[in-house]
Amino acid sequence: MNYYYMAMRGSLVVGLNTDLDHHLADEVRQVIDEVVEERGIRSIIFDFSKVTFMDSSGIGLIMGRYKKMHQNGRIAIVAPCRSVERILQISGLHKLVTVFESMGEALDSCEIHDDNIAAEKGGKRSVKY
């Protein structure tokens, strides 16, 4: 399997087990959009620890999910390699997403972010996974 996904602590974790190119980006995009819609996910965390290459379709995947999530959620990327981190810098995505060294840090940060948004809107989030 080239990727996995799971709902975890209010976030959708998407782990990629190979490089992110146009072949994989379209499939992952469809899965993410479906799960976010069905479960009311507010944050998406991409685990890039096994990704060594990302082309423009990977940038498009991240940018598209950012556009859908940025008002009520966030996008995080975990453990990108130097070449992928450079692509994030060159494309400007580093200004839109948060990069973390570990999954634990990303989950903690997204959970706090979700709780803060819920508090701003007058209540705690009550989405169950």
Question: Residues of each region from the PLM?
Answer:
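Amphipathic alpha-helical interaction surfaces in cytosolic regulatory modules
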Residues: H22-V97
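A charged, well-structured terminal subsegment
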Residues: E101-Y129
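Poly-acidic low-complexity segments
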Residues: D21, D47, A119-G123
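Residues that form or immediately flank small-molecule/cofactor binding pockets and catalytic motifs
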Residues: G10, R82, G104
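STAS-typified acidic loop motif
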Residues: N2-Q30, F48
